[in-house]
């Protein structure tokens, strides 16, 4: 998820979710991405996040947190210092599951880690990797065709076009444009942003994206949230994502507002 917090990523989120008051702070030791809307703190409609020295980030977070009613934060690898501070102030975390692929592995090992039935499906056709800004328009049309309507503003698509230009994203699509995905790359991480298909298997899209992210030097590829019970569609999507290998990681999620 760390790849989503570039300047363009934050601008995209504000186009998508509305204006936030930027309270982010940084120096040579750390960077804390945090914004305020009303009395709610988040990372511009995503979890608050820090890079670098957590102790410096905690001091900054404490100053910003004062007077806020609620917060959205993910504690990685157990209860970190900011998470402990939130628990001490009465906040209760819940587990958040996400699927992450280790791109330091070799390509043959990554292929072997996939579900056996996926290994052949991944080679069903040869997808194309694109960073051409104009291709965002073709992806937008596919998105509209699959959804039956336009689900977000033109400005969000314009921001993703800028992300392609800046090298912070890439598109993988089938030769026929019947399937495509958008992937966000930044800070050595790659995140599966969105994918759409008109019935064509998406397995080659994901496998090509994993290999391309590794080629770009990314060390991790995050497939996204894992849901194990409840909504059948979300459970099915999660099962599909797990088929590409990796491990299911647990973060502690503090989120006391919708």
Each predicted region: which residue ranges?
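Soluble or luminal CAZymes and related metallo-dependent hydrolases
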Residues: 53-57, 152-155, 201, 205
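A gly/proline- and charged-residue-enriched helix-loop-helix capping module
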Residues: 45-84
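Short amphipathic alpha-helical segments and helix-helix/interface helices
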Residues: 54-65, 83, 122, 157-161, ...
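Short, high-confidence coil segments that cap the C-terminus of an alpha-helix
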Residues: 18-20, 66-69, 215-218
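Aromatic (often tryptophan-rich) hydrophobic motifs at membrane interfaces
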Residues: 31, 42-43, 59-64, 167-258
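A structural signal for short, well-ordered beta-strand segments and their strand-loop junctions
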Residues: 69-75, 130-131, 171-173, 220-224
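Acidic-and-aromatic substrate-binding clefts and catalytic sites of carbohydrate-active enzymes
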Residues: 52-55, 76-82, 137, 199-200, ...
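A conserved beta-strand-loop-helix scaffold within acyl/acetyltransferase catalytic domains
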Residues: 1-39, 78-199, 212
